[in-house]
Amino acid sequence: MNEDPAQQAMKVLAKYPLCDRCLGRLFAGLGRGLSNAERGRALKLSVVMSLHAMSLSGRLPENARDVLANAGGAAAQVYVELFGSPPEHRSCYICNDALDKFLDEMPQRVADAVKEWGGSTFLVGAKVDPGVIAREERIKAEFGLAFGESIKSEIKRELGKRAQQLGPKVSFDRPDVVVMVSFPDGSVSVQPRRLVVKGLYRRLRRDLQLRPREALSHPLVARLINDTRSSRVGIVGLVRDEKEVRALGLGIPVEFHLGGPRVRLVPPDGSIIEAEGASLEVNSSVEASGPEDLSRRVRVYRCVLYVEGGAFESLQLAAASLRGKEVRQKFMGKEVSGVVRGAECVDMGGGLAECIIALDERLHVMELVSGSGTEPSLSGLLGTAAECVVADLLGVIPLR
């Protein structure tokens, strides 16, 4: 539409009372460096001046009284001059005169919410009453206004800009918290971004298994939850923490994804978080892998084996024949396969041997030794029973 914006504004004001901000927002795409309130005020002044000029030339239009009354304070003096008394106040058709006050009061609440949740960066989201949106869209459609923006967009922009002046910084990519505000009721809710703590997991106790589904009861997880004041946790990279197997040496690369944190301070690299025999060495460069990456990670174990008959030479031969072989296992109803990457044994006497065994992460070392659901296995190749008396995980490393 080629009609002058002031002429369009006059037509809108002939029917609908609007505050400066809601009128200006209907023309938000026109002009630069203006707030919607400034834009609306300028349009109203242009309309008032045009009507005043018309009245002085004796050609005041019939709808002038409604236009001036709906323009509010910007037209008050001209209205009195033309009609002899001040106009009755008419509330904004779109926001019911609530938007300016909302934008003045909410920035502090947004900034306080960011601080309360331990954030330094934020993003504002907005929920607007459907009735408000419908009234705004009705005017745009009725008058063919093509340069407006939504009230939701204005609320997010204005609150973000004003709250940022109070301390926290806006981040569009990875905000610590998203602060959702509701207009016009003023309710606030916070959606904190999960906090990720990366590192190397170790445990010295054999009886302190970390099960992801029961993670909240584990002392190390409980400490992380307490330190960050989080409400939930997800663990990436801990494919399994085997019963009775200590995790030593290089440890297991893991990520703890802490949900709902109110403290967002991640301990510096090299820090050790300990709890009852379990620890996490914080390392932000750790790349934890999920179940889909099992074929690309290798578990290295130190195992003490007992072989019936004490035939150490036979054990050496069996271990050597396993190296580089693909092994199939049935474990808890699932079939898996992987490669034994290395197996070296040292005789300890008395039928015992210390072995270093490296195998793809999807394989289970206890079953590889005993032969339970496994083909080939050490026991199978020996032709006699072999048992893993004790085992320690020395590390989980990427396959090279």
UniProtKB/Swiss-Prot annotation:
Does this UniProt record's set of keywords contain tRNA processing?
yes
Family affiliation: Belongs to the pseudouridine synthase Pus10 family.
Classification lineage:
Archaea, Thermoproteota, Thermoprotei, Acidilobales, Acidilobaceae
Give the binding site residues for substrate: 301
Q: Which domain of life is it from?
A: Archaea
* Residues in THUMP domain copies: 77-194
Record flagged with keyword tRNA processing: yes
Q: Which organism is it from?
A: Acidilobus saccharovorans (strain DSM 16705 / JCM 18335 / VKM B-2471 / 345-15)
Name the GO terms of the biological process aspect: tRNA pseudouridine synthesis
Q: Name one GO molecular function term.
A: tRNA pseudouridine(55) synthase activity
Describe the task this protein carries out: Responsible for synthesis of pseudouridine from uracil-54 and uracil-55 in the psi GC loop of transfer RNAs.
Give the InterPro entries listed for this entry: Pus10, Pus10_THUMP_arc
Q: What is its EC number?
A: 5.4.99.25
Reaction catalysed by this enzyme: uridine(54) in tRNA = pseudouridine(54) in tRNA; uridine(55) in tRNA = pseudouridine(55) in tRNA
* Cited Pfam families: Pus10_THUMP_arc (PF22023)
Name-wise, this protein is tRNA pseudouridine synthase Pus10
Q: Which UniProt keywords apply?
A: Isomerase, RNA-binding, tRNA processing
Per UniProt, the enzyme's principal EC class comes to: isomerase
